[in-house]
Each structure stands twice: as C-alpha cells, then as structure tokens.
Regions:
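A short, compositionally biased
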Residues: 49-52, 96-97, 172-175
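Residue-level signal for pocket-adjacent positions within structured domains
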Residues: 64, 74-75, 195, 206
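Short, basic/low-complexity N-terminal boundary segments at the transition from targeting/disordered tails
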Residues: 30-34, 75-84, 155-162
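Short linear motifs in intrinsically disordered
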Residues: 43-48, 91-93, 167-171
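Aromatic- and glycine-enriched beta-alpha-beta binding-site module
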Residues: 58, 65-131
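Short, extreme N-terminal leader segments that mark the start of a protein/domain
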Residues: 1-70
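A contiguous, surface-oriented mixed alpha/beta subdomain in the mid-to-C-terminal portion of proteins
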Residues: 102, 106-259
Length: 259
C-alpha cells in the first residue's frame, strides 16, 4: 500500500534562487498516477470519494491511514485512461496536490513547501503559472498552492487522529477482496484493513455518542458503505482489460509455401 511520497521522484524546497524563472503547467494529464492502485484519503474526503471508490485502511501500527482503492491489482489504476485523463468523478486531494508537497524538519516543527522537479509540467518556457514574479515575490498561484498544502496537512493530522482512534478501539481487522480476471482465473487484493461492523456496534454507548459528536461514527459507516464499490470496480477493470485485449491486433499467420 502507498507511502506519502510515492509519486514524488525529486522533491526539492521551492526558492527564488532555484525556481525564480520556473513555471508549472498542470492539466488533465494524470500519467503520474497510472501505476498507483491506491492513494491516501483524508477524512474530509470520505463522503465525496465514497460515491465511486472503496475506502480502506492501509499500513500497520501508528502508520495506519485511510486510502482509496483505484485498481484491483498492483501497478494498475483503472481511473486513468489511455489518454492519461482522469475517468472518475472525484480526484483525491493527494493527487490534486501534486507536484507540491510539504517536507517536515527533523523536530517536526517546521514545514517547507517542495516541488517535484521531475514533474512533466515543470518548465522554464513560461508555460502555465509562474511561481515567482519578476521581483522575486510569490505569485498568487504559489500563494494558493501554499494555502491548499497547509489545509491538506491540517486535514492529514486530523485524519491520523481518527485512524489512531480506530486502532485504540481495536475496530480494524485484516481483509481481502476477491475478483475474477478476464481469463476466468480468480485473484485477491489483500494487505489492507476494514472496520469490523459488529465491534463498532458493540462499543459502549458513551463512546458511540462521543464518536457521533465528532463525526467519527459517520466516517465509520461511510467507509463500510463504500466497500460496496469493490465489485463494480473489479467489473470496471475486467471490462477495460477485455477491451484492451480486443483492440490488440492478432498475430500474423506464417506465410505458407506456394504450390
């Protein structure tokens, strides 16, 4: 399952000295997400994401964090089309934040805004939005990026608290999803956890009431409901695989000898 920097190849701190003349052109190209079959999801995203994604919990111990499943097999994302466009209704904030990310100091007290210099849209030809103006000041674009990244980090911390709460209440259990491949073979997606509905319902009334007040209880049931998306997602990926196979030209037959 994913790490927080899994799509960043060369994230470096943004500075006027290094990036004063650089611009960023973003758009509908999600090729950087093609090989991701899951990405982290913030608690604030549960409701919009649950309409089409299955929300699960990845990681172990105090690193457990919610994620959305994007593909039923490693290295496959069924929401990135052949034209690299996003084919879903909702784009997770983890992907919308790219190519920017915060790096944290060793003491955890300072965050520095970084950019992945390997991003295809990072250029010195003036394409897209500049990071700094002619006087070396942040552009409005960079200010907006900084605001979004700060909000993301704040929501990340809140989501981590929610995940830790579930772990402390021992509500999570290992799970797997089974599905059929185009060739008729069965396969399974494992290595993630889900909430045990019976354990959730068996919590003391005071605990459930507290979770209801903090919206944690709603998040739990949104997660459980989202698991119904596993079957249509498997069907989506199977249909895409069959379409790809049908589009591939058949191998040419060897030429026979002339009589």
């Amino acid at each position: 399952m994913p790490k927080q920097l899994m799509i960043y190849e060369d994230a470096v701190p943004i500075s006027t000295e290094r990036h004063g003349e650089w611009s960023v052109k973003t758009g509908a190209d999600y090729s950087y997400a093609r090989g991701l079959n899951s990405v982290p999801l913030l608690a604030a995203e549960f409701i919009p994401a649950a309409t089409e994604f299955a929300i699960i919990f990845a990681g172990e111990g105090d690193s457990i964090f919610p994620s959305v499943i994007l593909g039923m097999r490693d290295g496959e994302n069924s929401f990135v089309g052949e034209d690299n466009a996003w084919q879903g209704k909702y784009v997770p904030a983890f992907l919308r934040r790219y190519p920017f990310v915060f790096s944290r100091s060793e003491d955890g007290g300072t965050f520095t805004l970084c950019i992945d210099e390997e991003f295809n849209g990072f250029n010195q030809e003036g394409k897209g939005e500049r990071l700094f103006d002619s006087e070396g000041a942040r552009t409005q674009y960079l200010e907006n990026v900084l605001k979004f990244t700060r909000e993301y980090q704040a929501q990340f911390n809140r989501t981590m608290q929610f995940a830790n709460r579930l772990r402390e209440l021992e509500l999570l259990e290992a799970a797997q999803a089974r599905f059929q491949l185009p060739d008729g073979q069965s396969a399974a997606l494992a290595g993630f956890q889900t909430i045990n509905r019976d354990k959730l319902k068996a919590l003391p009334g005071e605990t459930l009431a507290e979770m209801a007040r903090t919206d944690e209880l709603e998040l739990c049931y949104v997660h459980l409901q989202s698991l119904n998306n596993l079957t249509p997602m498997a069907q989506r990926q199977t249909a895409a695989a069959r379409t790809t196979e049908a589009a591939e030209p058949a191998p040419e037959k060897p030429a026979g000898k002339k009589k």
